[in-house]
Amino acid sequence: MAIDKHATPMLDQLETGPWPSFISGIKRLRDQHPDARINAVTNDLLGQLEHSYETRKGYWKGGTVSVFGYGGGIIPRFSEVGKVFPSSKEFHTVRVQPPAGNHYTTAMLRQLADTWEKYGSGLITFHGQTGNIMFIGVDTPNTQNFFDEINDYGWDLGGAGPCVRTAMSCVGSARCEMSCTNELKAHRLLVNNFTDDVHRPALPYKFKFKVSGCPNDCQNAIERSDFAVLGTWRDDMKVDQAEVKHYIADKGRQYYIDNVITRCPTKALSLNDDDTLDVNNRDCVRCMHCLNVMPKALHPGDDKGVTILIGGKRTLKIGDLMGTVVVPFKKLETEEDYESLVELAETIIDFWAENGLEHERCGEMIERIGLANFLEGIGIEPDPNMLSHPRQSSYIRMDGWDEAAEEWFARQAEAGR
């Protein structure tokens, strides 16, 4: 049956630019999908969006929608103009956790798409900044039906609200030669251990895990996660001098100096007269620029592990925060190594849950109570690698210095150092 299409003159303008338009995608569902229900839903969605553009006002409001046994994972959206656009008056979003490293098979994707077209609008986002697969547009009764079906063949809801959120990891060694750790294993162990905290919000605010296999940090873990695991190495960078000479012969000596040598932030690289490369590994800060420019000539070292940073977040209360190093280097090879990683995460979340204020991220708590108190609370000794910059004031308080020194020496003696 033909539907009465809403006029969308303002939305039509979004299709005139050089880039793909989400409006075109929604119109294809409205005009070409064989399911009349999806045609009607997307038609009213376009109508409401056009109305919002005309009035410069959003008409979605929140509410409470969940599936049995879960306290999160659904983003409720109810329309304030549902009488005018009845087919899209309930347009909830379902967050579904992706596989570690976003490794899918086409069969998995077809199965998910078929189930979503059966119950939802047909609109899917891979992936939001949360890391989830976002299934956008389902009414309240079909929310449970959709979840039941995908859960039967192995998928689970992601996090929403004050809980442990969906973890993310890069594709890792599956296609990246810079990988320094088993990203997918670390990802799965953390997610599996905190599944209950993902589904039942009971924390001060959100807590995110992200795992990047090398300092390139393709997952933006340093900037966007409360618990960032970054692959790294602590021995010397591996240099293939023959490939260095080949690169210089191909690009030219001046190009090499301008785009590799002078781009090193700590001036750790120098080019010899015979076109070989010297690396001052002590000064290398793992910025990865030279390795990215010359992936055949330069490679991470053999002594690989991870660096753990805590407290990254984007703007909310006190602006953007980069993660703070709490473990400069940790091997992840044995099962005991991975268990200790999970135990550290448990300790940090427990401390934050007890000491964080409502709606306060872990990094904001560290800013409030101080890094020294945070490290003491989670049982980690301070390390010079945790400093982001030298002291800015030469005036410091010395009261309590002797007692603090005695406590430090006592801890060192207890640890047998």
Curated annotation (Swiss-Prot):
Cofactors (names): [4Fe-4S] cluster; siroheme
InterPro entries per UniProt: DsrA, NIR_SIR_4Fe-4S, NiRdtase/SiRdtase_haem-b_fer, Nit/Sulf_reduc_fer-like_dom_sf, NO2/SO3_Rdtase_4Fe4S_dom, NO2/SO3_Rdtase_4Fe4S_sf
Listed Pfam families: NIR_SIR (PF01077), NIR_SIR_ferr (PF03460)
EC number: 1.8.1.22
Residues that, per the record, bind [4Fe-4S] cluster 1: C170, C176, C214, C218
Chain sites annotated for binding [4Fe-4S] cluster 2: C264, C284, C287, C290
Reaction equation(s) it catalyzes: [DsrC protein]-trisulfide + NAD(+) + 3 H2O = [DsrC protein]-dithiol + sulfite + NADH + 3 H(+)
Free-text cofactor note: Binds 2 [4Fe-4S] clusters per subunit.
Positions bound to siroheme: C218
A GO term for molecular function: dissimilatory sulfite reductase (NADH) activity
Keyword terms: 4Fe-4S, Heme, Iron, Iron-sulfur, Metal-binding, Oxidoreductase
The keyword Metal-binding belongs to this UniProt entry's keyword annotation: yes
SUPFAM superfamilies reported in the protein's UniProt record: 4Fe-4S ferredoxins, Nitrite and sulphite reductase 4Fe-4S domain-like, Nitrite/Sulfite reductase N-terminal domain-like
Keyword Zinc-finger in annotation: no
Group of enzyme by EC: oxidoreductase
Primary role: Catalyzes the reduction of sulfite to sulfide. This is the terminal oxidation reaction in sulfate respiration.
Protein name: Sulfite reductase, dissimilatory-type subunit alpha
Organism this protein belongs to: Allochromatium vinosum (strain ATCC 17899 / DSM 180 / NBRC 103801 / NCIMB 10441 / D)
